[in-house]
């Protein structure tokens, strides 16, 4: 069991309290298949902003011993081309549980950048009565027959950075007026990129513990209770080393508190290419075996 306040019994470092994200602007639904907001007006059209940080992120990552041995296989299927349609998939070990469709924004030494728009086709694992993982206790969920259900993403637009190293991805969120409002640090298994029969994708496993970060760089852990609850069922849970997950979050928080890339304002003014068309349905092969 993880120590409630930190790794190995250490007190957790906590920033000032972060108010409920988007309390005045946009709802971030806990279950992506239900209760999403109504379709928003599109973000203002314009050229993508991919300004480079004054601190070279590739050098920073390479110099950080916490990232050694965590190199992702993003180059194996790359380089990805801007505008390509991509499926971003989450697994619990080998079982597919979540898929969203988006576009490649860019792919270079800083990592793979994706745009996941509101309204994109997606699939999510649900119980036979239409409930999701977060709609019931984990002890009940693991006894449920489930099915992958296709729907659309009702949450907000997401700009996502999958870095070349590290067990995480960083997400940018804007309100419906196009104002940057949050970073989200998603702690996850190092991603694997792939190409198969003309389809491109990125596969990972969510590690459940996450972080919200405001533009002022205050921060707050998210979903600690879910991690704690699920660790009581090791034969069913997909996070083998919760201490390593928290340590990865703490590593990212050092960058947050230093105002270093990617938390230095890079891409906060991003706008998607207006020529990108959201697909009407998930592409063929979206449910292929894990790469």
Q: What residue ranges belong to the model's regions?
A:
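A hydrophobic, small-residue-rich beta->alpha segment in the mid-to-C-terminal subdomain
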Residues: 207-255
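Structured beta-strand/loop patches that form or line metal/cofactor-binding pockets in enzymes
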Residues: 152-209
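Short acidic-glycine loop/turn motifs at beta-strand connectors
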Residues: 107-110, 177, 213-216
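Low-complexity, intrinsically disordered or signal/transmembrane-proximal segments
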Residues: 17, 22-24
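Hydrophobic residues embedded in beta-strands of well-ordered beta-sheets
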Residues: 111-113, 180, 219
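Compositionally biased, low-complexity flexible segments
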Residues: 1-17, 37-39, 47-49
């Amino acid at each position: 069991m993880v120590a409630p306040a930190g790794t190995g019994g250490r007190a957790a470092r906590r920033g000032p309290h972060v108010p409920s994200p988007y309390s005045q602007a946009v709802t971030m639904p806990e279950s992506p298949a239900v209760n999403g907001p109504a379709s928003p007006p599109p973000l203002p059209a314009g050229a993508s902003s991919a300004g480079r940080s004054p601190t070279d992120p590739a050098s920073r990552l390479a110099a950080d011993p916490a990232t050694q041995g965590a190199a992702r296989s993003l180059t194996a299927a790359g380089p990805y081309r801007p505008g390509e349609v991509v499926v971003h998939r989450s697994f619990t070990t080998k079982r597919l549980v979540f898929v969203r469709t988006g576009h490649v924004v860019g792919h270079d030494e800083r990592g793979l950048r994706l745009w996941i728009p509101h309204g994109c086709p997606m699939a999510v694992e649900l119980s036979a009565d239409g409930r999701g993982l977060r709609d019931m206790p984990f002890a009940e969920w693991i006894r449920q027959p489930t099915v992958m259900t296709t729907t659309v993403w009702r949450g907000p637009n997401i700009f996502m950075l999958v870095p070349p190293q590290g067990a995480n991805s960083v997400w940018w969120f804007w309100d419906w007026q196009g104002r940057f409002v949050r970073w989200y640090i998603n702690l996850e298994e190092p991603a694997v990129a792939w190409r198969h029969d003309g389809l491109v994708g990125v596969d990972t496993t969510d590690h459940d513990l996450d972080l919200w970060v405001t533009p002022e760089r205050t921060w707050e852990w998210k979903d600690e209770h879910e991690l704690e609850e699920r660790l009581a069922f090791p034969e069913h849970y997909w996070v083998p080393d919760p201490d390593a997950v928290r340590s990865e979050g703490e590593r990212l928080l050092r960058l947050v508190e230093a105002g270093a890339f990617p938390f230095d304002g890079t891409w906060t003014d991003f706008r998607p290419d207006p020529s990108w068309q959201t697909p009407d349905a998930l592409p063929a092969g979206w449910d292929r075996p894990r790469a």
